[in-house]
Amino acid sequence: MGKACWPKDRQGRRLTWLGCLFVAVTAVVAVFAVIFRPASHTDASAPAQATHPAAERASPTRSASHPPVTWQVAGPFADLSVPLAGMPPVADPANIYADAGPDMLSPSVRGVPYRIYVPDSGGSTVTVIDPATYRVIGTYQSGLNPQHVVPGYDLRTLYVTNNQANSLTPINPRTGRPAGPNIGVDDPYNMYFTPDGRYAIVVAEARQNLDFRDPHTFALRHRIHVTCAGVDHIDFAATGAYLIATCEFAGRLVRVDLHTLSVAGYLNLPGAAPQDIKLDPAGRIFYVADKNHAGVWLINAATFKVTGFIPTGPDAHGLYPSRDARYLYVTNRGNGTITLISFATRKIVTTWRIPGGGSPDMGNLSPDGKVFWVSGRYDNVVYGISTANGHLLARIPVGPQPHGLCVWPQPGRYSLGHTGITR
């Protein structure tokens, strides 16, 4: 599709890709069928999940016409089990989030006021909330179509990704205000940081690029073009050796070798619209929210193959580990619910329902883990939810289409980006 007819807004891109999804998937499957290696969909450590249509289609015991498929691209690649040099050591191999427990604040963020920064993606502002009073205390200009508020690797600066303005707005969390002029970068839908802190990764969704940039100047250092539309969310292996990114409009995941900065393989999830992705505390399973199939895929971190599926709710979207790393919070944007999955059993523990409905999207926990703050994407509000019982504590009006809000400060030694994923 030529640049002249490519929609500038995310909704337009979504409609365009949905319109040609069937043709594109059919063509890709036909061309590459000879090199695909079907994945094994069983894992002795994972409980069976066959109660949902998506899980049934993925089961090898059924005649699925397009089962999940993993394939590699031309190498050679580094050994992905080798830790990334320069990454802070993992304190507890059984829990990669061990250094991000309740109130485990780094010296870099001690004394920083507790605030919620909300990008109003339907406009060009960031709304700032004082969670102690449930009140908006400031609204600041950012740039057109702000999508996420992203903490820097060193925890000292927040960055607003102004998607259609091709810029980042730096915010000083000690003052809660913009900290200088906008920084020009191409198509910043989302942003992450490599576990060694060497690069910022600007997720250029419309361009299908992962742009590796200097984490301070944001000068471009390396670019990876991925052959899947809608690349938008990322998480990293426990070793830091690779990342997995979701491609929403292509129904595909891509694995990138961080030793060599090259694509190491793809995983097809036919009919899926993968959203957020999160690694379990043990570093063994990536959970992938799937909007289309209303649930969460389980991907074996070592083999890059599907091991199960857990139905959660319509428009499954955001994924956040509890502060004690026992549960995964799944936001189901389509029916106003939040599902809790046990990391230990890989089964649903409970589901919380927002009174009167809602559209929970992206958010994060309070530093002590007692409140889950999440944007109401289509209701122009922010929800505060008690993690003790799921009760709604607050419903705070904000700007149009609030998206990837950032709760700050967060516990942890360093930030991997997004809305405040720390380890």
Model-based region annotation:
Residues 1-3:
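N-terminal intrinsically disordered, acidic low-complexity segments at the extreme N-terminus
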Residues 8-23:
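N-terminal Sec-pathway targeting helices
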Residues 14-15, 25-423:
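Predominantly soluble domains enriched in secretory-pathway, periplasmic, or organellar proteins
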